[in-house]
Amino acid sequence: MPYLTRQKFPVPLDRDQVAQDWRRRGYSCDAFTDPPGREWNNFVHTTNELVAVKGGRLKLTIDGEEIIAEPGDEVFIPKGVFHSVRNVSSSTTHWLYGYD
């Protein structure tokens, strides 16, 4: 399964629409707001994770592969895989995440 699905959701991204889609697929849906340069490094989870960018840009490193995610994109992070997330936007980035 590829990590990145470009333009999975229409922009502007609607959190309720994403939450409904993810619930149907067995995922939760929560939100993060990160300032420019914020990093979350070397995480690994026992569940699969989905990420969707609402506004801004994120650089995700998943098992050594770098991905730039933009508004409307969805990223799949498999369970048991090391990953990092960084706000590479010059402004605040708003993003959604969920676990199965």
Each model region followed by its residue ranges:
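Short acidic-glycine-tyrosine-enriched beta hairpin
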Residues: 64-79
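Short, conserved beta-strand element in jelly-roll/cupin
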Residues: 44-60
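Ligand-binding loop in jelly-roll beta-barrel domains
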Residues: 79-100
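Short histidine-centered beta-strand/loop micro-motifs
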Residues: 19-21, 39-45, 86-88
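A generic "binding-loop/recognition-motif" signal
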Residues: 36, 46, 65, 81-82, ...
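A short, N-terminal "cap"/entry segment at the start of jelly-roll beta-barrel domains
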Residues: 1-33, 41
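Short strand-coil-strand connectors
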Residues: 25, 61-65
